[in-house]
């Protein structure tokens, strides 16, 4: 099989044989589409970047004042975390459309960016926005813990957030654009899938939150320039890879038995393989 046959143009009407092939097809033929998704994601991340920039500038001014610096910095951190609740609502509202676009790519049925995004928002914004509120509140509680507690213990809530909450949210984001379910069922299903696929899911979680390490870069102009580049170029690839992986697990644990109409959707399965799957 030559390279041009392996990586087929999306317009040639032939489905890829597996999701790995689909992943590289999209990277090759629709990379600009992924960049557009990245720009869309950046647009909804801008309020959070603005809040963090405000925090950086205010902290710099407070540090130079030399008066009651510690208590003022604590107050600033708490104010910023409260402001970020609104930022997370905006971010998750935008994500409701972004994950719909990624689902369409995973099913090899890409739509136009803006109409597809809006379709996803109309279908999923309520659950996503509620999750944004919850994440914002948890962020405030984590900040309180880091301010009030001492030693290693103060980092435990943030660590639990990364190790438990973020992976469950990643699965919930996919479940919500694939199925119509109540939020409680989505979260319980997401938690079950996470613990069934823990190592790989944790790896994707770390890739998604990797940009937070940029907060340790001293110069905030460089920090946010790198962050913007990451969100536009790298994050869409990571999220698309995650979407393909998650949908593959949905096929394995759910779709094969309960939703055969979307089982292996977006990839070519020959009749022999399909027959073997049925007999298993």
Q: Positions of the model-derived regions?
A:
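Small-residue-enriched core segments of transmembrane alpha-helices in multipass membrane transport
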Residues: 159-163
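Helix-coil boundary and N-terminal low-complexity module in membrane systems
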Residues: 1-143, 147, 151-155, 168-170, ...
